[in-house]
Amino acid sequence: MNNRKPLQLSLLVASLAVAFTASATNADAHPPLAPLPPVPVPKDNPQSAEKIALGKQLFWDYRLSGDGSMPCVSCHLPALGWGDGGQISRGYPGTKHWRNSQTILNSAYYNKLFWEGSVNSLEEQAPSAAEGAVAGNGDPSVMEMRLRFVPEYVDAFKNVFGSQWPRMNDAYRAIASYQRTVVSDASKVPFDRYANGDKNALDTSQKRGMALFNGKAGCVQCHNGPLASDQKYYDLGLPDFAGFVDDPLYQVTHRWEHYQKGVSEPRYRAANMDYGLYYVTKNPKDVGKFRTPSLREAKYTAPYMHNGVFTSLQEVVDFYDRGGGSGTSKSELLKPLKLAAQEKQDLIAFIEALSMSEPLLHDDPTLPGEYQPLPAPIK
């Protein structure tokens, strides 16, 4: 029996862990970077080809929004890294959003969704987006009725879920199933190929960048494990988004978010910052903290950070090299790195090696036809 390849992989994982441990500023161990495991699937929403196909149609279907203009794909376009390419996500007509549209690439691996971790699963994420006032703004009863007047959907829901009529809870389950297919292909990710034994998958610059990532730059302190995210929350002291001050519609959205998330009266009146994790915990120590985003597919998912303040990986690396931003609650992990220009380029080269060599694209599905009168009263 040939045990050479497992031994090589074990040595690689060990070397990544040692590289960080030797240079870390604390004694905590961090999971090394590694290829993604199989996509986790909840027992109450198993995958099937038919459910995935239905979910893809629903992800693209304009009928799942208030005025029929904001399907899921409008903010998560495959050609734009499964985001929308803007600093701040486009809002529902008549509104403006207040955060960067996160990519849904590899979102199946997160234990919580949204920048402040406000929901626990893709099944919960879908309605939050489709029904959110500044996102899809769809009324679930109206969207459900629309689906019931489309014969193709009636048949598809009956086939997949065994229900007489389409139901929105099932629609969200189908969308979640589809999103679990929007994941990196390890055979096209240079780092994954390297980790799986192809020592030529990374070039010299990328290998130097990997050493920096796990060592001097300390990226692995937060961007670790297969997802390249510890899924924890930090205040980086990021620059503010000027629109919150300059644009009345952003102020409307910001104050509404404060109100519906239940912040204190003084914080509501100020409306001068995005409080992040605080909205979930109401712990003052969590003000300004946001979840560590995955670095997988970062090559294609600019702009970066919860407010889209950085347009390139160069800007991101420069920010961390300075020790992050300012603020009394800024993470103590952030310290000036004093990276040389070549080190920055090597680090960026390695971060890009966590992305596929070409972007993940899905063709638009064929959507069911127009509404048709029902042959019998709905029961």
Swiss-Prot record:
Induction of this protein: by what? Abundantly expressed under iodate-respiring conditions.
Could you tell me one molecular function GO term of this UniProt entry? cytochrome-c peroxidase activity
Q: Which GO terms describe its cellular component?
A: periplasmic space
Q: What catalytic activity is recorded? A: 2 Fe(II)-[cytochrome c] + H2O2 + 2 H(+) = 2 Fe(III)-[cytochrome c] + 2 H2O
Q: What is its main location?
A: periplasm
Answer whether the UniProt record assigns the keyword Heme to this protein: yes
Signal sequence annotation: 1-24
Q: Which InterPro entries match?
A: Cyt_c-like_dom, Cyt_c-like_dom_sf, Cytochrome_c_Peroxidase/MauG, Di-haem_cyt_c_peroxidsae, MauG/Cytc_peroxidase
PROSITE patterns reported in the protein's UniProt record = CYTC (PS51007)
Q: Which cofactor does it need?
A: heme c
Cofactor: binding comment: Binds 2 heme c groups.
Q: Does the keyword Ribosomal protein apply?
A: no
Q: Which residues form the Cytochrome c domain?
A: 50-158, 204-355
Enumerate the UniProt keywords alphabetically: Heme, Iron, Metal-binding, Oxidoreductase, Periplasm, Repeat, Signal
Query: Which EC number(s) are documented for this chain?
Result: 1.11.1.5
SUPFAM superfamilies in alphabetical order: Cytochrome c
> Its biological function?
Involved in iodate respiration. Probably reduces the H(2)O(2) produced by IdrA/IdrB to H(2)O, using a reduced cytochrome c as the electron donor.
Please name the PANTHER family in this protein's record: BLL6722 PROTEIN, CYTOCHROME C PEROXIDASE-RELATED
> Quaternary structure?
The iodate reductase (Idr) complex is composed of a molybdopterin-dependent iodate reductase (IdrA and IdrB subunits) and two associated peroxidases (IdrP1 and IdrP2).
Record protein name field:
Cytochrome-c peroxidase IdrP1
Q: Which organism is it from?
A: Pseudomonas sp. (strain SCT)
